[in-house]
């Protein structure tokens, strides 16, 4: 926010130079992001009165003027300004003057006629186009007759325009929205300087005509906890007096008209946005605060017709929506030069709805910013009354009797306690009760002190203070951060290390990268259609109240949705061979709004295209189920899980291929799944044949692990035997391997499947599998009797469990 130091001086006796004041504010309150004087380096610019205007003899668009600039003789100026006229009071940049941007103005000739300077527009003095009044966009600045009567030719124009003011640009933090007003800033500077601010006062004179006879209003408390209207009749809408325009443009706001400018002045003074309606153009005299109807449209003050969204708060008259509440007014009831009767609105609106409407309509205004961050609830009606009084004063209006109040509430000031002992414990100081009392006095906080405990009643203007820590902060910053004693950290130092879960996550990433997968990081938020895909957990995704886009509305329930988007991105750019993994959290809610959602650590991976490229020796190896299964098995082996890993075929996962998908169990615990992405799902994500897995790392972390140890390497030779069996075609190889391991006894060291055969000499409903069995004894050399006994146990178990035939 821009802060005028001259305006602050109306509140406080500030003797400090602006740069020292800025330093104190930065050290105590908020950062001063910039400091400047609008007149920067400009000089020799004065008030002048146009004495005569004659056409230029050699130009159809320029004129020759004689102006009184307070010197002995008139000064001749040649100008092309279309709005120059005799009798006007204007701004003159004299010979050897410097205007905005460092441009020097010198005496010269224009089409043969001498010009001793330049009549200037505000933009030529450095005014932004967004601040300069619209009436003078195409010409020079002309003072109105009322203001001109108080000006003297030759007077310093930069001073008259308020350009010798010092302006501070404050970086207001979210918790200090009270500084979005000059009153709030004055209270803060008063505390810094140990002064008492003198806030603006006003006198309101009302007519006998009652406001309630002219207008009515309704407002639900959940949309507008405060809402009131006032009526001012018989106003004359015209340019504001110079003092008011000067205040506005110094603060970066364009003057529009006396009525609108007063509402903007109240916004700057109190931090309370107000709005003015043309009473005579209201479709109905019944004003209502409500939410927008489906497809309801409003033509706003910028001339754009906008469609309101569900949940937007609108102000309606009868059945017609007039404006987006707290964001921007409507063209239908705009105050214009023809307006004679106005309705003033003062309100507090629900902040979330204002934020949603401002973002949805891309209408971030000074008003919406303040409603979003909060306003002083005790100033709403004060600002409304002050605006009515000032409009009556400068626009000649009559204020009708009373406010029409649709909604109000009694504010209960929060009471917060803090002890001197606690303050000193937190800050490491030895501050006394008297010093803390002095700080609360500087802040103008009411308090009671009882045996070292302060009971503080927080004023409404400081709604950021709600807990003990807030009071400690107030004490610290006004005591002076530089005055806090410097102390070294106490306590024993400990070596930094990863927690067990962090170590597991880091090892997972390392292993997957070693197995050929590249890490991807995708968005946590996704579409409602994708949020439920590939879910490993029962629960619901979480819907954002105000999503930033249609593609980022809900939290993900699986990492695979983002990974498939990443695959699609790569495939669309001619990168067909993709192997990616992501480690991150998924979010699961049980539907209870009073409980936080579960955040569960997962890891997922996808492969598509070729996992190995073509070489001179052999062709490319295409991605398939078994390539990915090998990656997952290696990863799980590195976790040293105490129980066996099982891959159980499943058809229950709708997004996965029903014949090429398996759930992954460790013991009886489901930890994930693996398989081919269903062709229809792949088509929806715009990817080719893709294989994927997802694991629950939190579940894996909680599983029992094998303790670190070592296995003796036998110095005796191993013995290998091959075993070929014939079984039904639907018997899983993993089940056969499990039976072999269980029946093989302690001597069986390793089992490897090395051949699967179907075809000639094998029945259509059968398949032949060949296993390589390795036997080892660490204590002696194996003999045939030992091995034969183990093989007989294995063949008997296979025949018994699977009706297997030994080939």
Question: Where are the regions that the model predicts?
Answer:
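Conserved mixed alpha/beta core segments that line enzyme active sites in large multi-domain catalysts
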Residues: 47-78, 257, 266-334
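Glycine/proline-enriched, intrinsically flexible loops and inter-domain linkers
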Residues: 5, 55, 63, 198-296, ...
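A carboxyl-terminal module marker
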Residues: 2, 27, 442-445, 612, ...
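Extended, well-folded interaction surfaces typified by the phenylalanyl-tRNA synthetase beta subunit core
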Residues: 416, 420, 424-576, 774-776, ...
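Phosphate-backbone binding interfaces of nucleic-acid-interacting proteins
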Residues: 1-203, 376-377, 383
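Beta-rich nucleic-acid/ligand-interaction surfaces
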Residues: 40-43, 206, 493, 498, ...
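Class II aminoacyl-tRNA synthetase-like tRNA-binding/catalytic domains
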Residues: 71, 108, 288-328, 332-335, ...
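Mobile "lid/hinge" segments at catalytic clefts and subdomain interfaces of large enzymes
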Residues: 115-128, 135, 315-411, 570, ...
